[in-house]
Amino acid sequence: MNPKDKRVNFGSMEPLIRDIGTVYEFYFDQNTFIESEIKTFLKEFETKRGDRDLYSLSQQTINANNTIVNINRSIHQSSQFLENINNNLNQINSKLSTQVENESIHQEQRNNDRLNKFELELVEKKSIEDSFNQRKSQIENDFNEKASVLRDKYQIVL
């Protein structure tokens, strides 16, 4: 016998391959089930996420509205306070300008007093110098007269 003749022929393999494919598909290929589970999970996730986003958006809207109310209240209060501050600043400014004017008047008076004092000192100095020069010339004249009298008396020749 020939080894080729010893082959056992079970017939066509197609039905066997089909049966194995069906068993594999049933037990191992879960793509359709997994896809439907994934789609369901994604729908639930997106729904929950949308709810969270809506809640977050509503909270942000509430916070923004509260912020706007606080800003408007602050603007109103600050406008009142700013008017008071502006009035106080105007009063202080007028007082300071009056004080500056008074100070400039006093400074001008002090400068005039200094100038007058300086002029008086100059006049007094000139008068003292004139008096000194007059006394000096008088003393020299007296000295010269007495020296001349003494020269004549003692007949001293210089």
From Swiss-Prot:
PANTHER family, sorted:
BIOGENESIS OF LYSOSOME-RELATED ORGANELLES COMPLEX 1 SUBUNIT 5 (PTHR31784:SF2)
Source domain of life: Eukaryota
What does the subunit section of this Swiss-Prot or TrEMBL entry state?
A: Component of the biogenesis of lysosome-related organelles complex 1 (BLOC-1).
What functional role does this protein have? Component of the BLOC-1 complex, a complex that is required for normal biogenesis of lysosome-related organelles (LRO). May play a role in intracellular vesicle trafficking.
Can you quote a single GO CC term? BLOC-1 complex
Give the family per the record: Belongs to the BLOC1S5 family.
Among InterPro entries, the record links this protein to:
Bloc1s5
Q: What is this protein called?
A: Biogenesis of lysosome-related organelles complex 1 subunit 5
